């Protein structure tokens, strides 16, 4: 085991030789994303500054290079291209983690290319109840509250920390938002174009079934 879910470590690992499995579901160790030579992992701990969101296990013999958080932040600040590489990899990883680990990377290229990273201040509204459903968001730093107008007043329904997602029902239909989402602290989100994703689902029937099953109990 390289690191375990909920650990406070925050360095980034690069795979020089071998493979690792990222266990994305704590209730099923067989639900994994496999990473090969040339890949890196641990970037979400670097970005969000929170506990590890997944367990990573070596798949046989591996040769890894560990880069401390401070060294990575220095690299990102001094080499503009480094941040772009890290951001792109993080978007791929987060979509695989939250939607389906088995999706082909090539299928996601258009989705990832159109995704953007946005910053919010505490109190900023990310989603407003009744708005058009045109994006899904992955919270990569900070936290959100979900609220709904009930009896003429806003009622908080849930709290969502970083490493989770909101607005996912936009991936399935364009119905108005059923709840509002607000940043509780300074936050950063990955904004995913729902129209492009719905077009992907229209071509990939199996993937659409997986997404529908995954989101059937969600509300936003």
What spans do the regions from the language model cover?
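Cytosolic regulatory regions built on CNB/CRP/Popeye-like sensor folds
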Residues: 1-220
